[in-house]
Amino acid sequence: MSDHPTAYLVLASQRSGSTLLVESLRATGVAGEPQEFFQYLPNTSMSPQPREWFADVEDQSILRLLDPLIEGKPDLAPATIWRDYIQTVGRTPNGVWGGKLMWNQTPLLVQRAKDLPDRSGSGLLSAIRDVVGSDPVLIHIHRPDVVSQAVSFWRAVQTRVWRGRPDPVRDARAEYHAGAIAHVITMLRAQEEGWRAWFTEENVEPIDVDYPYLWRNLTEVVGTVLEALGQDPRLAPKPVLERQADQRSDEWVERYRRDAQRDGLPL
């Protein structure tokens, strides 16, 4: 029996480059079927809708750009069924499991894990262990340029496309809004601070990768994760996703930096 871990969990915030990593790991065929399993809200069974990211915002110039809320249906599945589904769907035939967790999803994970039998503890680390079924390799992906990350988020939340290219017509309707981007920057910074505080509190030492390094060295990073799982690092593929940012995103980033300097917005 291998002494290597048989699971990994990518820890991140939205638009940090985590999809680039997990899709490359998925492409190996031996590194699980990683999904963002913990994004679904129990009251709707859906991932957060655009307006839910701006729940405390009253500025109508922001809200008018976001799709209205859909009611959804509550997720009534027992905790054990929920756990078993996650373990089954995230695993490749060789037994390796993969997943992705954002900091804003950690309360949901901890809350749902409370109802599992034979808990190993009550905190986040125990919740991860008890839901995944073992102690996974933890990989922390972060993006030092939070302005670019926030612009990417703001554009995606308007188009509802989180990977690949959006519909050109819908993308053309997306609008720059400094206040919305500022809101997202504050949210993303809080998520990253949450991860780093938790690492310190729990003495967790993940594989730590920033987005610029990941983008330039994707095959190497995938190989590192494969090696940690006891898999052949030579299976790491060439990049399978293209960069979503384009000239328009770059223009929004530069425009926001100017607005932030002038108006005292977060950077």
From Swiss-Prot:
- What are the alphabetically sorted keywords of the record? Carbohydrate metabolism, Transferase
Top enzyme category: transferase
- Is Transferase tagged as a keyword? yes
What the entry lists under SUPFAM superfamilies is as follows: P-loop containing nucleoside triphosphate hydrolases
Q: Which reaction does it catalyse?
A: alpha,alpha-trehalose + 3'-phosphoadenylyl sulfate = 2-O-sulfo-alpha,alpha-trehalose + adenosine 3',5'-bisphosphate + H(+)
Phenotypic consequence of gene deletion: Loss of trehalose-2-sulfate (T2S) formation.
UniProt cross-references to Pfam families, sorted A to Z: Sulphotransf
Superkingdom of origin: Bacteria
Output the InterPro entries linked to this UniProt entry: P-loop_NTPase (IPR027417), Stf0 (IPR015124), Sulfotransferase_Stf0_dom (IPR024628)
Pathway the protein contributes to:
Glycolipid metabolism
Q: What is the effect of changing E36A?
A: 100-fold decrease in reaction rate and 3-fold increase in trehalose affinity
Coiled-coil features, chain-numbered ranges: none
Q: Where is the active site?
A: E36 (proton acceptor)
Q: What is its EC number?
A: 2.8.2.37
Tell me, in a sentence or two, what this protein's role is. Answer: Catalyzes the sulfuryl group transfer from 3'-phosphoadenosine-5'-phosphosulfate (PAPS) to trehalose, leading to trehalose-2-sulfate (T2S). The sulfation of trehalose is the first step in the biosynthesis of sulfolipid-1 (SL-1), a major cell wall glycolipid in pathogenic mycobacteria. Cannot use free glucose and unnatural stereoisomers of trehalose (alpha,beta (neo-trehalose) and beta,beta (iso-trehalose)) as substrates.
Q: What else is known?
A: The reaction catalyzed by Stf0 follows a rapid equilibrium random sequential Bi-Bi mechanism with formation of a ternary complex intermediate.
Protein's recorded name: Trehalose 2-sulfotransferase
* Native organism: Mycolicibacterium smegmatis (strain ATCC 700084 / mc(2)155) (Mycobacterium smegmatis)
